Regions:
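Cross-kingdom TIR/SEFIR domain
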Residues: 1-24
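Charge-rich interaction segments
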Residues: 16-150
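Alpha-helix boundary/N-cap detector
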Residues: 18, 80-83, 163-170, 235, ...
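Short glycine-rich, low-complexity/disordered patches
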Residues: 36-43, 104-108, 181-202, 257-263
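Short acidic, glycine/tyrosine-flanked loop/strand segments centered on an H-E-D-like triad
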Residues: 131-160, 214-231
Length: 263
């Protein structure tokens, strides 16, 4: 048995009873071990492509305009030639499928521009209006510069998108591991950044999949503000693997700290 996307755990087993204690032991070993991450201060701000102001044109988000975006930029990368970008872009749908992040019955749409290739994922429709819906991936972009970005819907209910202090780190960690599982970025050091488009309608609250909220505190409503992290460090590639949870916690706390409700 092997975790193909990360290579973290590898062992053999005969029965489920034989496997379970090995998995539990490996989890305890990883939790008690040293952090796999190593950080280094950046000499200058990274040149990131943000999509916060682009809106959702071309994406099937079922009317949702507030999206979480996560960017991974490899350091010391020459980027891609037009031929390399096209080749990798054509492989993106297959790479997305292999990760298991998107169900096989959900269609994927590919698109391209001068500077990037993209794959979009249609949002799952809720059973009825106002039904709570968890966060979900809606787009993957690969830029000519080497940057790999994902956009996803935040958890939301009838009162709007939610920045849940517990759910947000888990969603970001999932996107980080998904990015690593695409097996595109292999450089030793990367820069990470996260942001939320149209954040005025978001609220810091607890997401409950079983029931929608009846009230929400929209401290940012009617105000113009940006909700994004400003990276000043690079980190090792383990941030897309064993160190994803640790990095995601930092990014989530930074986003929430910048929200007007946190003031």
């Amino acid at each position: 048995m092997e975790a193909y996307a990360t290579g973290v755990f590898r062992d053999s087993f005969r029965t489920a009873a034989d496997l379970l204690p090995k998995v539990a032991g490996k989890i305890r070993e990883l939790e008690s071990g040293p952090s796999p991450l190593a950080f280094a201060k950046l000499a200058q701000p990274p040149a990131l492509h943000w999509t916060l102001e682009e809106g959702t044109g071309g994406l099937q988000t079922d009317g949702v305009t507030t999206l979480l975006e996560l960017h991974v930029l490899p350091l010391d990368s020459a980027g891609y030639s037009a031929r390399e970008l096209e080749t990798l872009g054509h492989s993106l749908p297959g790479r997305v499928r292999v990760t298991g992040m998107v169900e096989d019955d959900i269609p994927l749409s590919s698109s391209r521009s001068q500077g990037h290739m993209a794959v979009s994922v249609p949002a799952r429709r809720p059973r009825s209006w106002g039904t709570p819906r968890p966060g979900q991936l809606v787009e993957v972009r690969l830029y000519k510069t080497g940057q790999l970005s994902t956009r996803a819907m935040l958890p939301q209910d009838s009162m709007g998108p939610i920045l849940d202090p517990n759910a947000l780190p888990m969603q970001i960690a999932e996107l980080l591991k998904f990015t690593g599982a695409l097996n595109i970025i292999t450089q030793d050091r990367i820069v990470l950044a996260a942001g939320v488009s149209e954040p005025a309608m978001t609220s810091i609250d607890t997401f409950d999949l079983r029931q929608s909220r009846h009230t929400a505190s929209l401290a940012g409503f009617g105000r113009s503000f940006a909700l994004r992290t400003e990276p000043d460090e690079s980190v090792t590639l383990a941030a897309l693997q064993a160190g994803a949870d640790e990095v995601a916690d930092h990014l989530a706390r930074a986003l929430i700290a910048h929200h007007p409700s946190a003031a």
